[in-house]
Each structure stands twice: as structure tokens, then as C-alpha cells.
């Protein structure tokens, strides 16, 4: 699989172009949530978006670039949701009682929020669990500097006063990678009860690793 760019090959400089890009991404998302991945082609995306295949290729070179753009858009939406639902409430609690921080509850809330997002967005679930995001895009979204772990890192540095070290960056990368694989394993379980059991074990494991085992 090639590492396709996550931004359009042609930046939309006009409102109409921006609307076309959003129609392409919306159409891809609809198809990803509705039909098997192998049937999601650039031709079907263009048809779903109501544009010509030539118009689609003005902005994206192939379907991998579109998949990556859909994934990045979802990650940004999720970051905003996580900030509102978990990070900001926890920050308010810490201002009142720093000693009351509960790492198990915090990480459980992060994971539960992510699971809820996957359940509500089948297109992102198909991409994330199907490992259809290109390596370069995945690398950027998993980075403690620019990706989702950066949000957790910022919270840990600013609110928990955890030292900023290369070891912390590595631990956040490990948590991100392990969490992704375990969530995929959880969704492979034949029953909802089985899925929930795997997720609960994952919460305990990652909490212990990130907050109990000292950075090396």
C-alpha cells in the first residue's frame, strides 16, 4: 500500500472547490459505512458524490488518499469531542482537587469515548480496524507531537506535572499502538459481552503501563 498524502493534490482555493472536497469525503464515508471495503472505488465515490471521475482526480490521486483524508477528518473530530467530554471536565476537577486524580477512571473515559465514536461512525471504524490508513498518515496521527497522543501528553504535562521525557513519548506511542490492536481484537469477538471483556482488560493493562510502571 502506498503512502498517499492526506491533503488534496490541488488545494481548494474557492468555496465551490472546498464543497467538492467535502462531497468527496462525505461520499467515501457513506460508502465505507455501507458496503464492503473492496467495493469502494474511486468511480463509486465519484458517483456517490455526484461528480465526474475527472473532477475527483483533480483533488485526490487515488482512493488511498481519500481514505486517509476521511480518517484524518475523523481524528480531528474525535480530538474535539475528547477535549469536550473528557479532558476539560477532568481539568476542572483537578483545579479543585489535584490529589483526586484517578488514572484508571481517566483512561477508561478516554477509551470509552473512543469506542463510542467508533460505534457511531462505521466508516471510521472500517478504516481504523481494517488498518487501511497509510503508514505515513498513521504515523502522524499517532505522534505525541502532532497526533491524538499529543492531547494526552499535554494533559499529563500541564495538569499532572509529569516530566517531559523521550521515555514518555515512547510510552504514549506504545499505548496508542497496543490500544489500536486490542480494540481491533475486541471488535472481532463474536458477542458484545466478549468485546466488553477485552476492552476492560485493555483498560487495566494500559493504565498499569502508563501510570503505575515508572518511565524507564
Where are these predicted regions, by residue range?
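N-terminal positioning helix adjacent to the helix-turn-helix/winged-helix DNA-binding module
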Residues: 20-27, 106, 148
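Amphipathic alpha-helical packing segments from all-alpha helical-bundle domains
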Residues: 80, 104-126, 135-161, 169-173, ...
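Hydrophobic alpha-helical connector segments
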Residues: 69, 83-119
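Helix-turn-helix
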Residues: 23, 27, 31-65, 69
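N-terminal intrinsically disordered/low-complexity leader segments
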Residues: 1-19, 214-216
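Secondary-structure edge/capping motif, primarily at the C-terminal ends of alpha-helices
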Residues: 82-93, 125-132, 159, 186-190
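Short, basic, alpha-helical segments at the C-terminal edge of helix-turn-helix-like DNA-binding modules
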Residues: 72-78, 84
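Alpha-helical DNA-contacting segments of helix-turn-helix folds
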Residues: 67-74, 144
Amino acid at each position: 500500500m502506498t503512502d498517499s498524502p492526506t491533503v488534496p493534490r490541488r488545494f481548494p482555493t474557492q468555496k465551490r472547490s472546498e464543497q467538492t472536497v467535502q462531497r468527496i469525503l462525505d461520499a467515501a464515508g457513506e460508502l465505507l459505512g455501507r458496503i464492503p471495503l473492496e467495493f469502494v472505488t474511486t468511480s463509486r465515490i465519484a458517483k456517490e458524490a455526484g461528480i465526474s471521475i475527472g473532477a475527483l482526480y483533480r483533488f485526490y490521486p487515488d482512493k488511498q488518499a481519500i481514505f486517509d483524508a476521511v480518517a484524518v477528518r475523523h481524528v480531528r473530530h474525535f480530538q474535539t469531542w475528547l477535549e469536550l467530554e473528557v479532558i476539560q471536565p477532568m481539568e476542572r476537577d483537578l483545579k479543585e482537587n489535584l490529589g483526586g486524580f484517578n488514572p484508571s477512571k481517566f483512561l477508561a473515559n478516554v477509551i470509552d469515548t473512543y469506542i463510542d465514536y467508533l460505534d457511531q461512525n462505521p466508516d471510521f471504524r472500517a478504516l481504523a480496524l481494517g488498518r487501511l490508513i497509510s503508514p505515513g498518515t498513521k504515523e502522524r496521527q499517532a505522534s505525541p507531537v502532532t497526533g491524538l497522543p499529543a492531547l494526552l501528553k499535554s494533559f499529563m504535562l500541564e495538569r499532572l506535572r509529569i516530566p517531559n521525557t523521550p521515555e514518555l513519548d515512547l510510552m504514549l506511542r506504545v499505548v496508542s499502538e497496543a490500544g489500536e490492536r486490542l480494540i481491533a481484537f475486541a471488535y472481532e469477538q463474536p458477542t458484545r459481552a466478549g468485546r466488553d471483556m477485552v476492552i476492560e482488560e485493555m483498560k487495566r493493562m494500559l493504565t498499569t503501563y502508563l501510570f503505575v510502571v515508572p518511565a524507564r
